[in-house]
């Protein structure tokens, strides 16, 4: 039984109430009684609106389902389909042209293109690593990944391999040649560095040369010519620091004494309360809120054990350099600028219950997140004894990513929620900025109207291929069987979706004002492939794109040196490369020509993916992790990948491509494989052979067999219910 404290119409879990009063409110000048009265009023006023938006989702889905069922044997008439969507209010009139007016936004969002990390906020170690990933060693990123092949004697090994190290150095020199070229020759020929009359000089066998663009020299640290100093360069707004120490193990092997090349990497990071976490009750939510508070105050720390040693990880300080003329100082942020991703409009959480007449109901989690992440983020706007030593925003803004919104009415509701939160917190209107995830179909086809609804708050739009595909499947569930999951990336609607997001953002004035982002690279171990392929995102006009790790951020940062995103956006300005008909093209299988073994392969792949993720989520509360696929390739999985897999199988089940028996048989085949993949985890509880005793196995089965009934195909209702059952069982056994 949850211990609760009454606050007006609210009954608040004591763990949350005490956290807010004892930890979050001190230093904000907000009176606790007035704060809780404000929370009560916001919940009372906005809950009916939230409920109505969810009813509208269900109403539209029911109308679309009915329309498709009446035409299931006919080819899709795209004109009739478009007209129908207009008639029911799904597809809205496009607004007149406008320009966003958001103000008070940090440079990391407005002018600096670079990688964006997404990390589960419930894990303090991950959160600290991500916040500190603003700067990363290129040498380490190259040496420790497959970007440098382990061939020709270049194996990683258990100790430093000079052959591999030399390949790393050569790769880094080639990078410097492209990002900050010399006026002649190559960085590979460098034998020393110096600063003369405020200019960087690079010594080579043929003499001393400067940079092709001298202004790219931004500063230095240490005493010039000393054994241990560094040079700061800048290109496309991103910094590169060359560390020089001829006495270091690596510097000894380098003709110029360079021991490392450090890149400005994760310019921004999203601390996630949503798809990458498993937060189902007050204890889970408070853990996340406390970590978010520590990140904003700058006092979050974590004991870390590595190589037999234990140390305390803390947030990095800012970095100070001497300006090129030797007379001034340049200070650069030592940490990533932090966003926080709240949950969407769907879920409730029993951290707070409220009285609706005679009935007690859980409060919508999205309303709670706006209030409590907004409150704790106040500490990131100022420094002091009560607020901590570090600052997040230098312009007085709090950045909140809002996911899974369906259309402009839901965006407008979020903006109203943010405005009400600002009133409760005593913040100026417009302090809470919004990042709009373009990951639901009704938002995609009405994106311009969605942006207009937040024109004075929006700082980011982002395509999320994974969730967007899940909604694509669920919206058109009754239209017929969908193509296989792996074929989705080559569909008409996907290209139109990615292009339209950039075009509409640029037309709304995002250049120089807000981020245009693109999605995650999920294959955490395949960094060579990432370096080869992910450059396509900045080439497409995106100022940021998601990466799964600090190492990936450093490697992806190279792409923003190779590509001038600002120039790409100028070239794309004014273009409209897609039509609404392309966006509405449903990815239906043209004919069911799959061989039985192909169907079995698809079902097994998806069942293994579902089990591999769900077993950790439900049994251990792990919301994001590297999950080996059926071929043992590690993939960064979260609820978005789960949504696709479960919805595809639900679709095939609905249209008779597979049967319930096929699903159960595949789950039973894949469970022992997943068990084996987790065998080294001492806390892991196998699903096989007692499948029906495993709540994780049953959750996976529920997600597929009842997938057509889940609201918009979301996985949270089933996951939360089963996770709560696991926690209840554990509490009873204790």
Curated annotation (Swiss-Prot):
<comment type="subunit">
    <text>Monomer.</text>
</comment>
<dbReference type="GO" id="GO:0000287">
    <property type="term" value="F:magnesium ion binding"/>
</dbReference>
<keyword id="KW-0816">Tricarboxylic acid cycle</keyword>
<feature type="binding site">
    <location>
        <begin position="125"/>
        <end position="126"/>
    </location>
    <ligand>
        <name>acetyl-CoA</name>
    </ligand>
</feature>
<feature type="binding site">
    <location>
        <position position="548"/>
    </location>
    <ligand>
        <name>acetyl-CoA</name>
    </ligand>
</feature>
<dbReference type="Pfam" id="PF20658">
    <property type="entry name" value="MSG_insertion"/>
</dbReference>
<dbReference type="InterPro" id="IPR001465">
    <property type="entry name" value="Malate_synthase_TIM"/>
</dbReference>
<feature type="active site" description="Proton acceptor">
    <location>
        <position position="341"/>
    </location>
</feature>
<feature type="active site" description="Proton donor">
    <location>
        <position position="638"/>
    </location>
</feature>
<feature type="binding site">
    <location>
        <position position="439"/>
    </location>
    <ligand>
        <name>Mg(2+)</name>
    </ligand>
</feature>
<keyword id="KW-0963">Cytoplasm</keyword>
<feature type="binding site">
    <location>
        <position position="313"/>
    </location>
    <ligand>
        <name>acetyl-CoA</name>
    </ligand>
</feature>
<dbReference type="InterPro" id="IPR006253">
    <property type="entry name" value="Malate_synthG"/>
</dbReference>
<keyword id="KW-0329">Glyoxylate bypass</keyword>
<dbReference type="Pfam" id="PF20659">
    <property type="entry name" value="MS_C"/>
</dbReference>
<dbReference type="InterPro" id="IPR048355">
    <property type="entry name" value="MS_C"/>
</dbReference>
<feature type="binding site">
    <location>
        <position position="439"/>
    </location>
    <ligand>
        <name>glyoxylate</name>
    </ligand>
</feature>
<comment type="similarity">
    <text>Belongs to the malate synthase family. GlcB subfamily.</text>
</comment>
<comment type="function">
    <text>Involved in the glycolate utilization. Catalyzes the condensation and subsequent hydrolysis of acetyl-coenzyme A (acetyl-CoA) and glyoxylate to form malate and CoA.</text>
</comment>
<dbReference type="GO" id="GO:0006099">
    <property type="term" value="P:tricarboxylic acid cycle"/>
</dbReference>
<keyword id="KW-0479">Metal-binding</keyword>
<protein>
    <recommendedName>
        <fullName>Malate synthase G</fullName>
        <ecNumber>2.3.3.9</ecNumber>
    </recommendedName>
</protein>
<dbReference type="InterPro" id="IPR011076">
    <property type="entry name" value="Malate_synth_sf"/>
</dbReference>
<dbReference type="InterPro" id="IPR046363">
    <property type="entry name" value="MS_N_TIM-barrel_dom"/>
</dbReference>
<dbReference type="Pfam" id="PF01274">
    <property type="entry name" value="MS_TIM-barrel"/>
</dbReference>
<comment type="pathway">
    <text>Carbohydrate metabolism; glyoxylate cycle; (S)-malate from isocitrate: step 2/2.</text>
</comment>
<dbReference type="GO" id="GO:0005829">
    <property type="term" value="C:cytosol"/>
</dbReference>
<feature type="binding site">
    <location>
        <position position="276"/>
    </location>
    <ligand>
        <name>acetyl-CoA</name>
    </ligand>
</feature>
<dbReference type="GO" id="GO:0009436">
    <property type="term" value="P:glyoxylate catabolic process"/>
</dbReference>
<dbReference type="InterPro" id="IPR048357">
    <property type="entry name" value="MSG_insertion"/>
</dbReference>
<feature type="binding site">
    <location>
        <begin position="464"/>
        <end position="467"/>
    </location>
    <ligand>
        <name>glyoxylate</name>
    </ligand>
</feature>
<keyword id="KW-0558">Oxidation</keyword>
<feature type="binding site">
    <location>
        <position position="341"/>
    </location>
    <ligand>
        <name>glyoxylate</name>
    </ligand>
</feature>
<dbReference type="Pfam" id="PF20656">
    <property type="entry name" value="MS_N"/>
</dbReference>
<keyword id="KW-0460">Magnesium</keyword>
<feature type="binding site">
    <location>
        <position position="118"/>
    </location>
    <ligand>
        <name>acetyl-CoA</name>
    </ligand>
</feature>
<feature type="binding site">
    <location>
        <position position="467"/>
    </location>
    <ligand>
        <name>Mg(2+)</name>
    </ligand>
</feature>
<dbReference type="InterPro" id="IPR048356">
    <property type="entry name" value="MS_N"/>
</dbReference>
<dbReference type="InterPro" id="IPR044856">
    <property type="entry name" value="Malate_synth_C_sf"/>
</dbReference>
<dbReference type="GO" id="GO:0004474">
    <property type="term" value="F:malate synthase activity"/>
</dbReference>
<dbReference type="GO" id="GO:0006097">
    <property type="term" value="P:glyoxylate cycle"/>
</dbReference>
<feature type="modified residue" description="Cysteine sulfenic acid (-SOH)">
    <location>
        <position position="624"/>
    </location>
</feature>
């Amino acid at each position: 039984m949850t211990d609760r404290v009454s606050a007006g119409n609210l009954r608040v879990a004591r763990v949350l109430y005490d956290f807010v009063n004892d930890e979050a409110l001190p230093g904000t000048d907000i009176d606790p009684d007035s704060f809780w009265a404000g929370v009560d009023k916001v919940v009372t006023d906005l809950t009916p609106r939230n409920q109505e938006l969810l009813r509208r989702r269900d109403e539209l889905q029911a109308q679309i389902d009915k329309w498709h069922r009446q035409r299931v044997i006919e080819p899709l008439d795209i004109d009739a389909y478009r007209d129908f969507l207009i008639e029911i209010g799904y597809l809205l009139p496009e607004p007149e042209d406008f320009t966003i007016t958001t103000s008070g936004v940090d440079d990391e969002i407005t002018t600096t293109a670079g990688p964006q990390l997404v990390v589960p906020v419930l894990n303090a170690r991950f959160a600290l690593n991500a916040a500190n990933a603003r700067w990363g060693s290129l040498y380490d990123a190259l040496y420790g990944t497959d970007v440098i092949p382990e061939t020709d004697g270049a194996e990683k090994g258990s100790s430093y391999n000079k052959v591999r190290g030399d390949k790393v150095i050569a790769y880094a020199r080639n990078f410097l040649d492209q990002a900050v070229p010399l006026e002649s020759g190559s960085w590979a020929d460098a034998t020393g560095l110096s600063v003369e009359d405020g200019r960087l000089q690079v010594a080579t066998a043929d003499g001393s040369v400067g940079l092709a663009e001298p202004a790219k020299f931004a500063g230095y640290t240490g005493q010039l010519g000393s054994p241990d100093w560094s040079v700061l360069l800048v290109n496309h707004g991103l910094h590169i620091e060359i560390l020089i120490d001829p006495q270091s193990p690596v510097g000894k092997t380098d003709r110029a004494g360079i021991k490392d090349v450090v890149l400005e990497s994760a310019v921004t990071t999203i601390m996630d309360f949503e798809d990458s976490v498993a937060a189902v009750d007050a204890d889970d939510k408070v853990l996340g809120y406390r970590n978010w508070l520590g990140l904003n105050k700058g006092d979050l720390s974590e004991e870390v054990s590595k190589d037999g040693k234990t140390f305390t990880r803390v947030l990095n300080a800012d970095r100070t350099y001497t300006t090129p003329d030797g007379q001034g100082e340049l200070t650069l942020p030592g940490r990533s600028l932090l966003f926080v991703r709240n949950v969407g409009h769907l879920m409730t959480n029993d951290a707070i219950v409220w009285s609706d007449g005679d009935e007690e109901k859980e409060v919508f989690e999205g309303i709670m997140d706006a209030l409590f992440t907004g409150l704790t983020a106040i500490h990131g706007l100022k420094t002091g004894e009560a607020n901590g030593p570090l600052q997040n925003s230098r312009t007085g803004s709090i950045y909140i990513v809002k996911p899974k919104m369906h259309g402009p009415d839901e965006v407008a509701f979020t903006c109203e929620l943010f405005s009400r939160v600002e009133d409760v917190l005593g913040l100026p209107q417009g302090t809470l900025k919004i990042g709009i995830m373009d990951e639901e179909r009704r938002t995609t086809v009405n994106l311009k109207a969605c942006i207009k609804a937040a024109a004075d708050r929006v700082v980011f739009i982002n395509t999320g291929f994974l969730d967007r595909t899940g909604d694509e499947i669920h919206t058109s569930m009754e239209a017929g069987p969908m193509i296989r999951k792996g074929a989705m990336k080559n569909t008409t609607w996907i290209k139109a979706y990615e292009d339209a997001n950039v075009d509409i953002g640029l037309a709304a004035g995002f250049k120089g004002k807000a981020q245009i982002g693109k999605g995650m690279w999920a294959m955490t171990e395949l960094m060579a492939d990432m370096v080869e392929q992910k450059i396509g995102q900045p080439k497409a006009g995106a100022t940021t794109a998601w990466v799964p790790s600090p190492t990936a951020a450093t490697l992806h940062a190279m792409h923003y040196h190779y590509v001038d995103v600002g120039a790409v956006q100028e070239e794309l300005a004014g273009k409209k490369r897609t039509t609404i008909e392309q966006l509405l093209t449903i990815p239906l299988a043209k004919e069911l020509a799959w061989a039985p073994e192909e169907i079995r392969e698809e079902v097994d792949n998806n069942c293994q993916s579902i089990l591999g993720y769900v077993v950790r989520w439900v049994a251990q509360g792990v919301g994001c992790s590297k999950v080996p696929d059926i071929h043992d390739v590690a993939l960064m999985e979260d609820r978005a990948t789960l949504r696709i897999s479960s919805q595809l199988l639900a679709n095939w089940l609905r249209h008779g491509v597979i049967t319930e028996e096929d699903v159960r048989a595949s789950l039973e085949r894949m469970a022992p494989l997943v068990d084996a993949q987790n065998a080294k985890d001492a806390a892991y509880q196998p699903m096989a052979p007692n499948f029906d005793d495993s709540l994780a196995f049953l959750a996976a089965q529920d997600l597929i067999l009842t997938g057509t009934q889940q609201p918009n195909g979301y996985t949270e209702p089933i996951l939360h219910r089963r996770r709560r059952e696991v926690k209840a069982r554990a509490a009873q056994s204790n």
